[in-house]
């Protein structure tokens, strides 16, 4: 989600200014300014943000295709050959040569309020109003093109689904002292499993409580 922070409110790909620099497709200098920006054009404040994002993504994934979420459930992530952010922006320098560090480009990052923007409705700061990009890979090569349909669309609407919590985690909503589970209108497998786990736990609790105490007053396991 952080991938869209630099564009909020301006609709340009590299700017934090009222209009930003849209001429940074040729790369940026070590000072962070666009090489072909005119003297009256604001410097692209976030022109090097891709470096930090790439380091963060690589450090998080560590070459693995999965990473655990807070519940410890494996969460599918993007592989190393296609480290596209789900918001569809790709990397920031717009270079298309594989010899470049961040060679993946993006087809558009311009909101509908921009004169070169999307034909869809919404403001320039709304990620879903940006043109959708489609990322495809062949081996280690990645191509990103503007897309209107397909399975590889990458924007907020097409975010990957989140993994549901383990069914046993759902039993926390039930009190351990209840004798009947609360009614559930859902018949999905996860809810059924949660109800089943609840019944087993309650059954064990009742079974233990019916065992007569031993001579010293303790209930055997």
Swiss-Prot record:
Composition bias type Low complexity, residue spans: 13-36
Bias (Polar residues): 37-48, 149-160, 174-183
Origin: domain of life: Bacteria
Region (Disordered) location: 13-51, 90-183
Compositionally biased region (Basic and acidic residues): 130-139
UniProt record similarity statement: Belongs to the adhesin P1 family.
Protein name: Putative adhesin P1-like protein MPN_131
Organism encoding this protein: Mycoplasma pneumoniae (strain ATCC 29342 / M129 / Subtype 1)
């Amino acid at each position: 989600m952080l991938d869209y922070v630099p564009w909020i409110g301006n609709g340009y790909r590299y700017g934090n200014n009222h209009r930003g620099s849209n001429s940074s497709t040729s790369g940026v200098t070590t000072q962070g300014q666009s090489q072909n920006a005119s003297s009256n054009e604001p410097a692209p404040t976030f022109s090097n943000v891709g470096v930090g994002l790439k380091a963060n993504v690589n450090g998080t994934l560590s070459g693995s295709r999965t990473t655990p979420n807070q519940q410890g459930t494996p969460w599918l992530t993007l592989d190393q050959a296609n480290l596209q952010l789900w918001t569809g922006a790709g990397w920031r320098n717009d270079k298309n040569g594989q010899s470049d560090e961040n060679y993946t480009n993006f087809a558009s990052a311009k909101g509908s309020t921009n004169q070169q923007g999307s034909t869809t409705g919404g403001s320039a700061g709304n990620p879903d109003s940006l043109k959708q990009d489609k990322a495809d890979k062949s081996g280690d090569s990645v191509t990103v093109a503007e897309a209107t349909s397909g399975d590889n669309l990458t924007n907020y609407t097409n975010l990957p689904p989140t993994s549901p919590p383990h069914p046993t985690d759902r039993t926390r909503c039930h009190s351990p002292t209840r004798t009947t589970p609360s009614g559930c209108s859902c018949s999905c497998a996860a809810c059924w499993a949660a109800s089943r786990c609840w019944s087993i736990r309650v059954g064990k609790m009742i079974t233990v409580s019916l065992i007569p105490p031993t001579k010293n007053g303790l209930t055997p396991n």
